[in-house]
């Protein structure tokens, strides 16, 4: 799994320059140098919108930044998963992180880039999608640049026995 199993049992700690709580809507908004911690999870950004149910359980989070950033430590791993994008959505019930616009996810030397990266934290599955292919211009053919997903997967290193 992406997160340590104990992360969900930890309190959520949030720091920001400004906070606004709307109990009727079940939403809290934080602005300005926002930082979030929960167990091994650390997120930073400019704006955080957090939605809660009637029992004050977290449902989802949307972090906006230039870029917004997150880091998590997976179970049975010493290598953190890090991600950045203009928008990072965390869906607690689905155990899913969705990164949108200039999204990058890294784990050690592995790297995925795309317009949209969907990370299933429970099953450790990454799905990346590019922007629609760019139209042809004077200096680039149609489909060049933005319309691609990029992955870097290092070779497996043989360890001496």
Predicted regions and their residues:
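Mature-chain termini and adjacent capping regions
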Residues: 1-161
């Amino acid at each position: 799994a992406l997160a340590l199993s104990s992360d969900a049992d930890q309190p959520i700690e949030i720091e920001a320059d400004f906070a606004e709580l709307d109990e009727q809507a079940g939403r809290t908004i934080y602005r300005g140098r926002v930082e979030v911690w929960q167990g091994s999870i650390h997120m930073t950004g400019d704006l955080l919108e957090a939605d809660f149910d009637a029992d004050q359980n977290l449902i989802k989070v949307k972090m906006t930044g230039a870029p917004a950033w997150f880091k998590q430590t997976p179970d049975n791993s010493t290598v953190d998963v890090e991600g950045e994008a203009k928008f990072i959505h965390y869906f607690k019930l689905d155990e899913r992180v969705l990164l949108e616009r200039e999204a990058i996810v890294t784990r050690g030397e592995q790297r995925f880039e795309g317009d949209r990266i969907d990370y299933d934290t429970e099953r450790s599955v990454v799905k990346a999608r590019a922007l629609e292919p760019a139209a042809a211009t004077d200096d680039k053919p149609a489909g060049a640049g933005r319309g691609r997903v990029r992955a870097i997967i290092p070779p497996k290193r043989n360890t001496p026995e």
